């Protein structure tokens, strides 16, 4: 194992541990599909690709239509006592911990409306979750007392959470901020069709600060930032600066597919030390992203050892809920970065 670890460290920019390699080996015991190996191992995709290449060099796996152990590889995993991944998840809620029993009508109406939604745009690192995930977000936020009669800010709305919020009739007011005019226009059209008046929709690149009128104006925000430290600080910082004060809430997703645990630690330090907020919830694989259709344009495709489009959902993120306290503060400065907003060594969907 030590030899493999050293070879991966020499090859990869991403922090790697023996546990990283064990996770990938365990995932390969479960599936030969590269995308599912990334999903099950919960290691950043570029690192998984590097590990698999080293395993191939060492004669432990063979790569053809899938990734499979050689005889030498099978002996190796037996000698280290590595078993297959056990992915036992509740079949009712898919591990989210919320019930959609009282939200079935909302779910069906949402599905119908978003059939004609704009498709994800690679330029903006877009991707959207399943309708069940979007409505589960509504259920989660409502269960925490963060929606009813509240002013809600949506920072980036690939998932059309604002439409689900309108259909729920729970918030007092909704404000949507997005860089993509296609999404902005679609949300406006739906608001007109629903005759929903309590919504504002603005086009803004979040590298720039929010308009001053949105400072300390909201009870709740939700966002789904790109997963560079720059982007996390910017998107979440903007959300915190828009909250009215203490004991207000923010929601966002962070993956293990594009963020190592080292990056998670940096993100959590930013949340706790810089923003002075409390992390109240982290729900594993809450968000399931529909395969976005531009896979062949991404870094993930270039790195994938098997050039085969994913057949199942593999890209998932953990849902974070944070809450502000007396000394919490956000981030309001303009960010002067380009591609670094979307890309770092662990990125793969850009």
Curated annotation (Swiss-Prot):
> Which chemical reaction does it catalyze?
2 S-adenosyl 3-(methylsulfanyl)propylamine + spermidine = N(4)-bis(aminopropyl)spermidine + 2 S-methyl-5'-thioadenosine + 2 H(+)
Is the keyword Transferase in the record? yes
GO molecular function terms listed in the Swiss-Prot or TrEMBL record:
transferase activity; transferase activity, transferring alkyl or aryl (other than methyl) groups
Any Pfam family the entry gives: BpsA_C
Where does this one sit in the cell? Cytoplasm
Recorded coiled-coil stretches: none
Q: What is its EC number?
A: 2.5.1.128
What cellular component GO annotations does this protein have?
cytoplasm
| Main subcellular location of this protein, as a coarse class | cytoplasm
Entry superkingdom: Archaea
Q: Any idea what job this protein has?
A: Involved in the biosynthesis of branched-chain polyamines, which support the growth of thermophiles under high-temperature conditions. Catalyzes the sequential condensation of spermidine with the aminopropyl groups of decarboxylated S-adenosylmethionines to produce N(4)-bis(aminopropyl)spermidine via N(4)-aminopropylspermidine.
Q: What name has this protein been given in UniProt?
A: N(4)-bis(aminopropyl)spermidine synthase
Please report the organism this UniProt entry assigns to the protein.
Answer: Methanocaldococcus jannaschii (strain ATCC 43067 / DSM 2661 / JAL-1 / JCM 10045 / NBRC 100440)
Gene behind this chain? bpsA
